[in-house]
Amino acid sequence: MKTLLCRHGRHTEIGYDPGIQNPSIGDEFRRASGLAIVLTVLSFEDKREKVYKELLEIYGTVTPKSARIKYEDLQHMNYLDRFIKETMRLFPAAPLIGRHLTEDVKMGEFILPKGVEIVVPILSVHRNEKYWHNPLIFDPDRFLPEKIGTAYNNYYMPFFLGPRNCIGMKYAMILIKVVLATLIRTFIFKVDKRIQIDEIKLNMDVTLSSVEPIEVKIEKRELR
């Protein structure tokens, strides 16, 4: 609700409001890759500190409570935006999605007949070296405007593609940005040993989650 009011000029803050945000945060992270996976990615020190440096340029070292996130601030979080997109490429909320064919579809030598149900393996597409250079390397800069090409337009689908894509994708991106910006401004995330992307075993269920628990150390930043 705050986001909608802000967008229409009736509210300028996207505050850290427990009454509005907390239920949504838990729900969103269950769908957006799982909190453990997101925190693991945040433990990649070089990438995390790039995000933090960008946030320092916007807010300085004051606490999120003293300098709350405003809607217009989100437009300046360019690296964070790429960081989130790369996380969703490697760990899409929904690793698979079903579709009902309304017409025959030719795939190579085969024809999928109208009326059948198909499954689109989003995770496999996102990690396919045919479409992505070094697909198992976490590289937010692959989403720089000058690098975006056919892979982004045709093979990047964390919210799926076409007229039946996720209607809440813009809201989800805003919410994830606010949550991650708040977490990164407040805490430092570390792991004893850097985990490689291909070492994270995943459950291919309705939503993506890790098979094994992922331990992440959390330290509070010294802020004023």
Regions found by a protein language model. Give the residues of each.
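Conserved cytochrome P450 K-helix E-x-x-R motif and the immediately C-terminal K′/meander segment
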Residues: V62, S66-G108, E129, E212
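Conserved cytochrome P450 K-helix/beta-meander segment immediately N-terminal to the heme-binding cysteine loop
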Residues: L74, V120-K147
